[in-house]
């Protein structure tokens, strides 16, 4: 018989930096999930990823207090800020430009995010990434 799901929890955790301190510890603890077990499993699974990059993770926890988790790719905004060497986007997107990004870099980001995006092909994924870039005040050139 399959385990009964008690719920799901979505967190964004830095790769290789899961520890029992807030906000991870309290979020897991109040649901009865073993905090250290999650931290060790997450850090081991995120070992291959760039240290410190924000990783969205969906934790499914069961009534017997066990859990499974699925890691996604970092958010598009993280990739865009990294590609354009920015600390943050424009305060007034559409009016003030925060910088520029090439279509080649947009394609690279789209290829990295393809499995998490709801897009049929790479061109559709690129349009989604370009929309996010415009929302941040980035200008897509080339």
UniProtKB/Swiss-Prot annotation:
Q: Which UniProt keywords apply?
A: Methylation, Ribonucleoprotein, Ribosomal protein, RNA-binding, rRNA-binding
User: Which BP terms does GO give this entry?
Assistant: translation
A single Gene Ontology MF term assigned here is: large ribosomal subunit rRNA binding
Task: Give one Pfam family.
Answer: Ribosomal_L11
InterPro entries xrefs:
Ribosomal_uL11, Ribosomal_uL11_bac-typ, Ribosomal_uL11_C, Ribosomal_uL11_C_sf, Ribosomal_uL11_CS, Ribosomal_uL11_N, Ribosomal_uL11_N_sf
Concerning PTM, the database record says: One or more lysine residues are methylated.
What Gene3D superfamilies does its record include? Ribosomal protein L11, C-terminal domain, Ribosomal protein L11/L12, N-terminal domain
- What GO CC annotations are associated with the protein? cytosolic large ribosomal subunit
Its biological purpose is as follows: Forms part of the ribosomal stalk which helps the ribosome interact with GTP-bound translation factors.
Complex and partners: Part of the ribosomal stalk of the 50S ribosomal subunit. Interacts with L10 and the large rRNA to form the base of the stalk. L10 forms an elongated spine to which L12 dimers bind in a sequential fashion forming a multimeric L10(L12)X complex.
- HAMAP family this protein is in? Ribosomal_uL11
Q: Which family does it belong to?
A: Belongs to the universal ribosomal protein uL11 family.
Q: Protein name, please?
A: Large ribosomal subunit protein uL11
């Amino acid at each position: 018989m399959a385990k009964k799901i008690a719920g799901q929890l979505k967190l964004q955790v830095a790769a290789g930096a899961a520890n029992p301190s807030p906000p991870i510890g309290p979020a897991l603890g109040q649901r009865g999930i073993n905090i250290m077990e999650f931290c060790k499993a997450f850090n081991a699974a995120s070992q291959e990823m760039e240290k410190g990059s924000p990783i969205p993770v969906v934790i499914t926890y069961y009534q017997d207090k066990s859990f499974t988790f699925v890691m996604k790719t970092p958010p598009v905004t993280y990739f865009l800020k990294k590609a354009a060497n920015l600390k943050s986007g424009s305060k007034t997107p559409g009016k003030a430009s925060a910088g520029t990004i090439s279509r080649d870099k947009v394609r690279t980001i789209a290829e990295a995010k393809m499995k998490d995006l709801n897009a049929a092909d790479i061109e559709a994924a690129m349009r989604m990434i370009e929309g996010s870039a415009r929302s941040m005040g980035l200008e897509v050139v080339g």
